[in-house]
Swiss-Prot record:
PANTHER family assigned: NUCLEOTIDE-SUGAR TRANSMEMBRANE TRANSPORTER
Protein origin, superkingdom: Eukaryota
Keyword hit for Transport: yes
Topological region Lumenal: 64-73, 140-146, 192-202, 265-280, 343-402
Keyword Transmembrane helix attributed: yes
Keywords, ordered alphabetically: Golgi apparatus, Membrane, Sugar transport, Transmembrane, Transmembrane helix, Transport
Function: Sugar transporter involved in the transport of CMP-sialic acid from the cytoplasm into the Golgi. May transport important nucleotide sugars such as CMP-Kdo (2-keto-3-deoxy-D-manno-octulosonic acid) in physiological conditions.
Intervals, Cytoplasmic compartment: 1-42, 95-118, 168-170, 224-243, 302-321
Regions that span the bilayer: 43-63, 74-94, 119-139, 147-167, 171-191, 203-223, 244-264, 281-301, 322-342
Compartments reported by the entry: Golgi apparatus membrane
Protein name: CMP-sialic acid transporter 3
Family assignment from sequence similarity: Belongs to the nucleotide-sugar transporter family. CMP-Sialate:CMP antiporter (TC 2.A.7.12) subfamily.
Length: 402
């Protein structure tokens, strides 16, 4: 990917290489002018995510019968993607009707195909999300809902590292310490939280649980970072059109999961409606709403804010699971919540003051190259100006001594 710099004297265009991971200029402008409306949107996003993310493990737990699922978890994920696709299509139709005179329609075949090519990167997070959504059900076989949410908070640390490597995001020293404190808080909650004397897949429960935890933390972290990267790199594209591509890829991957399940377990397992109840219908709607809300986080806010809002949802999940299912809130859980809240306060209150938009950081090499070009242009301007304002008999004399 490259850009051009035009000389103001000779109008020659010079190719300037840009960082491959650069965020779009449209998002750069958007982020540099954050208004009170944007802050209100962040509060609304966090509040909605706290409720939806807090309900998710509760609903999954309610769907279990005798400690097992009567339905295929992949079928829930597939129906969730279909629900989100329907929502995206409805919003696109509404948005298309509100186009002003002179605005380019985005539902034409040529525009749609061009947008599909530009947003092909969304297939990467869609694949990771398909794997992660299945892992959410598997994790419920090892931990209670409150513990699942605490384990999910480990994603913040992994996401921070991925953001620094992939999107060149900058963090202050205190922010890194806050993330380390978050890891300590989660570890406190895990002390003596695993059941003893049981096993699964032929492995001791601790080994199996920690193996799933590794995937449960890494896969969604990769999905979130690549989702933010894909959405912001095409910031001018309608978010509902981007969601349509993302959910379309997700539906394809989950359908492949259903086919693989049918091959392994037999054709009878291909019935996507088998074993579902009212609880699973609520779960599908909740997962769809949570996925739609997440896309607004990734495009208009950032991944770290999304994960910290999920951390706040831990309190809601812990209290709700204690009230509904009689799970005990141990002293470890209370201490862990306290540490996590302190960590979140430290992280949000110690951001880099002179932080510039990530796109400017990622295009630092291009700006440096442009500064060198501007020096040449300024020298050319000064010489041209001097030549223009020469008067008298010597106006045809050379600018430089012979």
């Amino acid at each position: 990917m490259s850009g051009e710099v035009e000389c103001r004297v000779c109008h020659a265009k010079v190719q300037v290489p840009m960082a491959a991971a650069a965020v779009s200029k449209a998002y750069d402008i958007h982020r540099s002018s954050v208004s009170s409306r944007q802050r209100a949107l962040n509060v609304l996003l966090v509040s909605g995510d706290c409720v939806l993310a807090g309900l998710q493990p509760i609903l999954v737990y309610m769907c279990k019968v005798d400690g097992k699922f009567k339905f295929s978890p992949v079928s829930v994920n597939f129906l969730t993607e279909i629900t989100k696709i329907i929502f995206a299509i409805i919003m696109l139709c509404i948005q298309a009707r509100r186009l002003k005179v002179g605005e380019k329609p985005f539902l034409t075949v040529s525009t749609f195909m061009q947008a599909a090519r530009n947003n092909v990167l969304l297939a990467v997070p869609a694949l990771f999300y398909a794997i992660n959504n299945y892992m959410k059900f598997v994790m419920q076989l090892y931990f209670n809902p409150a513990t699942v949410k605490m384990l999910g908070n480990l994603k913040v640390l992994v996401i921070a590292v991925l953001l620094k490597v992939i999107m060149r995001r900058r963090f202050s020293t205190i922010q890194w310490e806050a993330l380390a404190l978050l890891l300590i808080g989660i570890s406190v909650n895990q002390l003596k939280s695993l059941p003893e004397g049981s096993s699964t897949l032929g492995l001791p429960v601790a080994a199996g649980a920690y193996l799933y935890t590794l995937f449960f933390v890494t896969v969604p972290a990769l999905a979130s970072v690549y989702n933010e990267k894909a959405l912001k790199s095409q910031f001018d594209t309608s978010i509902y059109l981007q969601n349509l591509f993302l959910y379309g890829y997700g539906a394809i991957f989950n359908f492949l999961g259903l086919v693989i399940t049918a091959i392994i377990q037999g054709p009878s397992s291909f019935n996507i409606l088998e074993g579902h109840s009212k609880a699973t219908m609520f779960l599908i709607c909740n997962n769809a709403a949570q996925g739609i809300l997440s896309s607004f986080f990734f495009k208009y806010a950032d991944t770290i804010l999304k994960k910290y809002s999920s951390t706040i949802a831990t309190i809601f999940t812990g209290v709700a699971s204690a009230v509904l299912f009689g799970h005990t809130l141990t002293i470890n859980f209370v201490l862990a919540i306290s540490i996590v809240i302190i960590s979140m306060h430290q992280y949000l209150s110690n951001q880099i003051k002179d932080e510039v938009p990530s796109s400017k950081i990622e295009m630092g090499d291009a700006h440096e190259h442009r500064s060198k070009e501007s020096v040449v242009v300024n020298v050319s301007d000064s010489i041209a100006t001097e030549a223009k304002h020469r008067h008298g008999t010597d106006e045809r004399q050379p600018l430089l001594p012979v």
